[in-house]
Amino acid sequence: MAKNKDVRVTITLECTNNCAQNNEKKKLGVSRYTTQKNRRNTPTRLELKKFCSYCNKHTIHKEIKK
């Protein structure tokens, strides 16, 4: 039997804005999304513009290591 490498992997996207360090907001935390990507089509780290509930605006979310 041949080894089957996972082509589609589950990744985590994290907000790049400093939501946790912003003292003006009442909510403190980090916005994270989980999604899947195809390793063959996108070998580099993924960056998507998603809504951050802590910043209350659309910000860039980058792929993080697990």
From Swiss-Prot:
UniProt key word Transit peptide: no
InterPro entries linked: Ribosomal_bL33 (IPR001705), Ribosomal_bL33_CS (IPR018264), Ribosomal_bL33_sf (IPR038584), Ribosomal_zn-bd (IPR011332)
Biological process according to GO: translation
Pfam families linked to this entry: Ribosomal_L33 (PF00471)
Location of this chain's protein in the cell: Plastid, Chloroplast
Coiled coil regions, renumbered to chain: none
Molecular function (Gene Ontology), one example: structural constituent of ribosome
Keywords of the record: Chloroplast, Plastid, Ribonucleoprotein, Ribosomal protein
Superkingdom assignment: Eukaryota
This protein's GO CC annotations: chloroplast; ribonucleoprotein complex; ribosome
PANTHER family named among the record's database cross-references: 50S RIBOSOMAL PROTEIN L33, CHLOROPLASTIC, LARGE RIBOSOMAL SUBUNIT PROTEIN BL33C
Family according to the record: Belongs to the bacterial ribosomal protein bL33 family.
Record-given protein name: Large ribosomal subunit protein bL33c
Gene symbol of the encoding locus: rpl33
